[in-house]
C-alpha cells in the first residue's frame, strides 16, 4: 500500500505540474512568468525522472537521470522566493533580483551533482533507487536556503501591505518541508524520495494564481 501511495503522489504531482504550467502561462504577469515556467518545469522533470525509476527495466538510463532526481532541493526554495515576492505586494522591489538568485542556486546545484558519485539499488516495491554520494550536502544546502526564506517571511509579517495570511501559509509550509528533510537526514524515510513538500508548494502557487487577473499586464 505504501508503494501505491508513492506512485499516486508522483502521478498527482506530474499532473499538477502540467496544470500549473498552463495556468502560469495564462495568468502570471510577464515579469515572473518566465521564472515560474522554469521552476515549475524543474518540478515536472524531477517527478517524471522519479516515476521512470519505478518502471524502468534496465539501469543503463538511470545515470542520465542523475541531474534531475534532486531538483526539488532548488525548485522549492526558488518557488518560495516567487511566492514571497507576490505576497509582499511591493511596488518598489524589482523581481529581476530573483533571476540572479536562481542563477547562483542552479550553479551550486550543478557543482554538487558533478562532484557526486551515483549508486543504484533495486527495491522490490519502488524499482530502482538512485543515491548520490553528497546527498547530505544537498539536503543541507536546501535546508540553508529554506531557513533563510523562513526568516525572511517572518520579518515580512510586519510589512504594512504584505498578504499576512499568504505569508503564514508560506511559513507553515517551509516548516513542514524542513521537518521532512531533517527526518530524512536522520535516516527515516516513508518513501524513497521526498514528495510531500513539492505537492504543498504546487498547491500554494495555484492559490497565488487565483489572485492574478487575466487582465494584468502581460
Residue ranges: model-predicted function:
Residues 145-218:
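C-terminal transmembrane-bundle signature of multipass membrane proteins
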Residues 9-15, 32-56, 75, 169-185:
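Hydrophobic alpha-helical transmembrane segments of multi-pass membrane proteins
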Residues 59-70, 125-133, 189-200:
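Non-cytosolic membrane-interface motifs at loop->transmembrane helix junctions
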Residues 17-25, 51-62, 67-102:
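Internal transmembrane alpha-helix with an interfacial aromatic "cap," most often the third helix
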Residues 26-42, 92-100, 161-172, 195-196, ...:
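Membrane-interfacial loop-to-transmembrane alpha-helix junctions, especially the N-terminal start
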Residues 1-16, 133-143:
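Hydrophobic transmembrane alpha-helical segments in integral membrane proteins
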Residues 87-149:
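Membrane-proximal helix-loop-helix units in multi-pass membrane proteins
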Residues 51-60, 112-122, 179-189:
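Juxtamembrane "helix-exit" motif on the non-cytosolic side of transmembrane helices
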Amino acid at each position: 500500500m505504501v508503494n501505491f501511495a508513492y506512485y499516486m503522489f508522483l502521478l498527482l504531482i506530474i499532473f499538477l505540474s502540467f496544470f500549473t504550467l498552463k495556468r502560469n502561462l495564462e495568468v502570471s504577469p510577464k515579469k515572473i512568468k518566465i521564472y515560474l515556467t522554469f521552476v515549475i518545469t524543474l518540478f515536472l522533470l524531477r517527478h517524471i525522472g522519479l516515476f521512470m525509476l519505478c518502471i524502468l527495466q534496465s539501469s543503463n538510463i538511470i545515470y542520465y537521470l542523475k541531474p534531475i532526481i534532486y531538483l526539488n532541493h532548488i525548485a522549492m526554495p526558488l518557488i518560495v522566493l516567487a511566492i514571497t515576492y507576490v505576497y509582499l505586494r511591493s511596488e518598489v522591489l524589482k523581481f529581476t533580483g530573483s533571476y540572479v538568485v536562481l542563477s547562483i542556486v542552479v550553479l551550486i546545484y550543478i557543482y554538487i551533482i558533478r562532484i557526486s558519485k551515483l549508486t543504484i539499488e533495486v527495491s522490490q516495491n519502488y524499482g530502482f533507487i538512485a543515491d548520490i554520494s553528497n546527498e547530505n550536502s544537498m539536503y543541507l544546502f536546501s535546508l540553508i536556503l529554506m531557513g533563510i526564506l523562513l526568516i525572511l517571511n517572518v520579518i515580512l509579517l510586519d510589512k504594512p501591505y504584505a498578504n499576512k495570511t499568504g505569508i503564514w501559509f508560506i511559513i507553515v509550509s517551509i516548516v513542514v518541508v524542513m521537518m521532512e528533510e531533517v527526518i530524512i537526514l536522520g535516516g527515516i524515510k516513508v518513501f524513497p524520495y521526498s514528495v510531500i513538500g513539492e505537492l504543498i508548494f504546487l498547491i500554494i502557487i495555484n492559490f497565488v494564481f487565483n489572485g492574478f487577473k487575466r487582465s494584468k499586464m502581460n
